[in-house]
Amino acid sequence: MSEIVAEWGGRIFYDGAHQAGLIAGGQFQDPLREGAAVLTGSAGKTFSGPQSGIIVWNDPALTEPITHAIFPVLAATHQVNRVAALAVSVAEMLAFGEVYLAQIVRNARALAAALDRRGIPVLGKPKGYTSTHQVIVDVRRFGGGNELAQRLATANIITNKNLIPEDRPEDWDSPGGLRLGTIEVTRLGMGEAEMEAIGDFIVRIVSGQDRPEAVVNDVVEFREPFQTLYYCFENGFPPNTVTATAQDRKDQR
C-alpha cells in the first residue's frame, strides 16, 4: 500500500489505537517498518498506560509540521503528571511487554475457545479466533449485543456491543455482536485456566441459564483473590510465568 500511495505523493497514517501495545510487545506487525509514515495510538488499551494519545514517526522531515500542529494549533498545554506516568509505562513495556502481550493473546484465544465449546459462535474460528486481545462473538440468537452487554454488566462482567458481518450501519446501537478483551484480567495475573471460568460465567448469562443476579456473587468470589497488578516494576511477573524472550526462543531453535 505504501508503494502505491507514494506514487501519488501520499503517505500512510496508521491508526494503532487498539494495537499500540501489541506492536510494542512484538505481537503485531510494525507499521512504520512496513511503510507507514505516522503511527498514532492510545497510551491506554493494550499499552496499559495513562489515558492519552501517542504519535510516532521516523521521518525527521515530519517533526516540525506534526509538533506545530499539536502546539499551538490543537493543544495549548499538557499534563506533566501524565507524561511521568507514560514514561513509567514505556519503561515497563520495555521490561515486561513481550511476555505480557503474549499472555494477553493466549488468554484471548483460550477465552474464545471456551465460549465456542459452550455453544457461543465466535468470529474468526478458522484462523484461530484472534491474534489480538479481542474476541468477537455472535449473539444474535441470544438477544443481541446491546441487551447482553447490559445483562453481563449487572453481573460485573464488562463487555461492549459490536457490529458484526451482516449487521447494517443503522444497527450500531443494537448490533449482533459482543466484544470481549483480556487486557485487565491478564494484568491481574490470570491465565488460560481462568479463561475457562470466565467463559462459564458468560455462557450462564448469555444462554439464559441463569439471571445476572444469580451469577454476580460467583463473579465477585472468583475475582477476589486477584488483587495484584503484575507485569510492572513493583510486582514483576505473575508466579509460574514463562518469560522466554524472542531472542531466547531464537537461540533455542
Indicate residue ranges for each PLM-predicted region:
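Conserved PLP-enzyme active-site core in the AAT-like
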Residues: 1-121, 139, 182-183
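Short helix/loop capping segments that flank catalytic or ligand/cofactor-binding pockets
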Residues: 22, 49, 146, 188-189
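Short acidic (Asp/Glu) and glycine-rich catalytic loops that position anionic groups and cofactors
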Residues: 63-68, 83-92, 127-134, 174-182, ...
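Hydrophobic alpha-helix feature that most strongly marks membrane-spanning transmembrane helices
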Residues: 71, 91, 109, 116, ...
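Intrinsically disordered or highly flexible coil/loop and linker segments, enriched in small
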Residues: 75, 79, 99, 117-121, ...
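Conserved small-domain helix->loop->beta segment predominantly found in fold-type I
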Residues: 90, 101, 105-149, 159-174, ...
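PLP-dependent enzyme catalytic core of the Aspartate aminotransferase-like
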Residues: 106, 171-253
